[in-house]
């Protein structure tokens, strides 16, 4: 039998997904290109208390809003080297998507905004790669987006 997306060993991997994701959320929170970070490990998250009870080891899902809107988000995503663009999240590798041009492409803009999918919104499924490698990739992508924004002014 084949196991879809490595479900047979997910219990071994989940702590790495969660710790990587929490560390990246923390670092993103202080990055100049980030408007908002959405991750249940952050006390500012509206569901922080519930998340601590329901999933105390955390989650590998991470979302954030990049300053500069959708163009900056796309530049960020296209500039990544080890994190791959995908619309199906949740494997061993780190994946990224900009919902406005993938999963929510055909959802009316007003409805997207009501759901929190605002300009610059990025969603990631953090994998089990080395967290320092992931951060270097993310920081480099954010710097590429910043450079693009400066060049546009």
Residue ranges and their predicted role:
Residues 78, 94-153:
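PLP-dependent enzyme catalytic core of the Aspartate aminotransferase-like
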Residues 1-11:
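Single conserved hydrophobic/aromatic residue that forms the stacking wall/gate
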Residues 2-4, 88, 94, 125:
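Short linear Ser/Thr-Pro motifs
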Residues 9-12, 60-67, 122-127:
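Short, well-ordered beta-strand elements within core beta-sheets of diverse protein domains
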Residues 18:
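Catalytic core of tubulin tyrosine ligase-like
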Residues 22-91, 107-113, 152-153:
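Conserved small-domain helix->loop->beta segment predominantly found in fold-type I
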């Amino acid at each position: 039998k084949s196991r879809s997306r490595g479900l047979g060993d997910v219990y071994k991997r989940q702590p790495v997904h969660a710790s990587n994701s929490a560390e990246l959320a923390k670092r993103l929170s202080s990055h100049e290109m980030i408007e908002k970070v959405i991750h249940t490990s952050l006390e500012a998250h509206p569901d922080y208390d519930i998340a601590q009870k329901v999933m105390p080891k955390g989650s590998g899902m991470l979302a954030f809003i990049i300053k500069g809107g959708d163009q900056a988000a796309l530049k960020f995503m296209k500039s990544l080297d080890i994190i791959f663009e995908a619309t199906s999240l949740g494997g061993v590798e780190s994946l990224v998507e900009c919902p406005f041009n993938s999963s929510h492409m055909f959802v009316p803009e007003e409805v997207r905004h009501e759901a929190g999918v605002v300009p610059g919104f990025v969603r990631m499924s953090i994998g089990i790669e080395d967290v320092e490698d992931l951060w270097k990739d993310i920081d480099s992508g954010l710097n590429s987006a910043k450079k693009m924004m400066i060049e546009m002014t």
